[in-house]
Amino acid sequence: MNVLLPQPIETEAISLLEEKNCIVTTAPDPKPETVLPLLKDAHGLILRTGITINRELIEHADELLVISRTGGGLDNVDVSAATEKGIIVTSNLGVNTVSVAEHVLSMILALSKRLILLDNAVRNGNFGIRYQNLPRDINGKTIGLLGFGRIGCEIGRICHQIFDMQVIAYDPYLPDGKKAEYRSWVTFAELYELLSKSDVISIHVPLTDKTRHLVGDAEFSLMKTDAILINASRGGVVNETALVKALQNNQIAGAGLDVFSEEPVPADNPLLQLENVILTPHTAALTKECVTRMATEAAKCVLDVFDGHEPQNVANPQVLESGRWKRLQADRSSQNC
């Protein structure tokens, strides 16, 4: 079976595939025009974030059985087109939870303690900045979580248990029964209430039509002037123009961004000129340990499909009822007899 990698993945995952006699092809680059001809013979595709697998590409993938995302998001896959084609789409929900949570907490602390500003001051001979008392504690403060899935929950847990922070969450999609499990330490509230009461606001929602520009001018006007905003979900959730204005006008104290509306970030993006922002290049989940976990789990999903087994975290379970999937299962079952 042929497995296509639009971008390189960890050697541990490639070894896993090759041990099962898969032929692994890595594209020279993740451009659509490069990947398209390689899709013709691919049975499995392991996908990172460097390319969007759109309808046009999927229509050329006649042999493709599975698209396996290394991460949890599916905004770079046309799931509807894949479903129509009978292609299983899987994601890696939960695999990057701890790594992303650690990254977010690092940003919260770095912004609150003004680490980058103080580091630059010392390097430039301004040791006297210590008398300005710029750092702030987070202990006992309030963190607001936009989205209370795995990552949001983990960040809230750490902030509550370690820093004695009050936790407010906004998640209209979380069932009431599930919310009840957390009410001993989480207050679920409407968005406006969360924004007005939180000292730290951290975003953990997927990018959809409903969440695009979820945070804009109106939302920034509700925030405390000493609040900090963290976004490690998707760039489009925050209106960057409104964010720049809020930072320039001191509507909020600072922001930590791992994601952007356009990636890579253009050289003329005004965020690059602001001192009250920490920017990282979409690396919250890209620790050595996490990328290995994500790649190997994505490879396991591909192998499960090849073996006729239902993989984990199927985004389009209706494909499992299709004739194509039933025939694959029957074929693999007969081979094992």
What is the role of each PLM region?
Residues 132-225, 336-337:
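Rossmann-like dinucleotide/phosphate-binding beta-alpha-beta segment
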Residues 85, 93-142, 154-158, 162, ...:
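Phosphate-binding beta-alpha-beta segment of Rossmann-like dinucleotide-binding domains, i.e.
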Residues 89, 226-337:
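Rossmann-like dinucleotide-binding domain for NAD(H)/NADP(H)
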Residues 1-90, 196, 216, 222, ...:
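An N-terminal-biased, well-structured beta-alpha scaffold segment characteristic
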Residues 50, 72, 199, 205-207, ...:
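Short glycine-/small-residue-rich Rossmann-like dinucleotide-binding loops
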Residues 58, 62-65, 77-89, 203, ...:
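Beta-strand-loop-alpha-helix segment that lines the small-molecule cofactor/substrate pocket
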Residues 2-3, 22-26, 97, 168-170, ...:
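Structural/interface elements that position substrates and couple domains in central-metabolism enzymes
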